């Protein structure tokens, strides 16, 4: 629902350092810059380990997407896994399972599909209004390129949330969401509807 209001910036951080970065940005934007915006941050009570903050991720956190960990060197296929919020732990678990099958994984954290969509729409508008100039790339395109590497985005939200950015994703983009919201009383029960 938060994505339907253009004055709302909706966030779904997975880790404490993402939350801290978003709060710091939000305070600056609302207080120091006096912007008429609301920051809606989904914060969960699920207990899981918090890793240290990687270097040079602030821009990606605020833009909505950053690479948490690159694929290990080696042979075999690569997949890009995108997670947000507490389901990131299952993304990290999936990496180990995929390694058993010889599949290497890049791990990406999506802190805001709404911000990614906002950027994509702004770039599309600029390109439409400036047909005589070289086309710009949106942030997703600059990060993920035009690769044939499969991308799987998983979310504890309905699949419609990560699907908001499908237009700017490379071709091999699949979305898995927990569309059983309202039919469950716990996160584990919610994930029974994961598809």
Residue ranges of model-derived segments:
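Thiamine diphosphate
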Residues: 3, 10, 18-22, 27-195
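Ferredoxin-type iron-sulfur electron-transfer modules in oxidoreductases and energy-metabolism complexes
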Residues: 15
